[in-house]
UniProtKB/Swiss-Prot annotation:
Species this chain originates from: Pseudomonas syringae pv. syringae (strain B728a)
Listed name of the protein: Sugar fermentation stimulation protein homolog
InterPro entries found in the cross-reference section: SfsA, SfsA_C, SfsA_N
A matching Pfam family: SfsA
GO molecular function, one term: DNA binding
Family according to the record: Belongs to the SfsA family.
Gene from which this protein is expressed: sfsA
Length: 237
């Protein structure tokens, strides 16, 4: 996926109220833009750090742009716009990049399912039945490590999705959780036990129930982003 329009660059001043960020563009313009990420963004919001944003020409929008990419203190690029992950995964699915999930005959997004009234990111149809696929965007990395972690903040919603997938798996329905790692320089991903032990426990229970766990990494520049490789998943035993 190519970023269109082309991203503009600036420096982060501050992120606040979770969904807002003040930046200074390279031309010296001061802007308040939308932050499309509900997490803590622990390694992605250093004041003075480089950021890239998309600018909107829609006069009905309250904010002129959307924060898309951060440069982390480790010099990595992270796509912090969590809404991009599902688009990337759909592109990869249709291109056959995710080898474990090829052969489907139909794809639907945001399908209602489950006892807790969730909406799954993708429902893939195969000749022998449905596959339910939940996607999580990963951007949390650490100094000196090529292993990313999820989540970067406590996520009750993430644990609920795992419970829903586990219920399907126990009923004999194929259920998959895919970590879409939108952070450069990463070889593997793990559950962030130290941040959300309840999520890590729910992940282990989902695996025991038969949920399949996958991780794929994205190639990322300020011009384009696309999924290009499978990653290892650590900490599942």
């Amino acid at each position: 996926m190519r970023f269109s329009p082309q991203l503009e660059q600036g420096r982060l001043l501050v992120r606040y109220k979770r969904f807002l960020a003040d930046i200074e563009t390279d031309s010296g313009e001061l802007l308040t833009i939308h932050c499309p990420n509900t997490g803590s963004m622990l390694n992605c919001m250093m004041p003075g750090g480089r950021v890239w944003f998309s600018r909107s020409n829609d006069p009905k929008r309250k904010l002129p742009g959307t924060w898309e990419i951060s440069e982390t203190p480790q010099g990595r690029l992270a796509c912090i716009n969590t809404g991009r992950a599902n688009t990337l995964v759909e592109e990869a699915l249709r291109a056959g990049v995710i080898s474990e999930l090829t052969g489907f005959t139909a794809l639907k997004r945001e399908v209602a399912y489950g006892q807790e009234k969730s909406r799954v990111d993708f429902r893939l149809e195969y000749p022998d039945g449905y596959l339910y696929l939940e996607v999580k965007s990963v951007t949390l990395g650490f100094d000196g490590s090529s292993v990313a972690a999820f989540p970067d903040a406590v996520t009750q919603r993430g644990a609920r999705h795992l419970r829903e997938l586990a219920t399907l798996a126990r009923e004999g329905v194929r259920a998959v959780l895919l970590y879409c790692v939108n952070l450069t320089g990463i070889d593997a991903v793990r559950p962030a036990q130290e941040i959300d032990p309840a999520y890590a426990a729910a992940l282990r229970e989902a695996i025991d129930a038969g949920v399949q766990i996958l991780a794929y990494g994205a190639q990322l520049t300020s011009e384009e982003i696309f999924i290009d490789r499978r990653l290892q998943v650590h900490g599942l035993d």
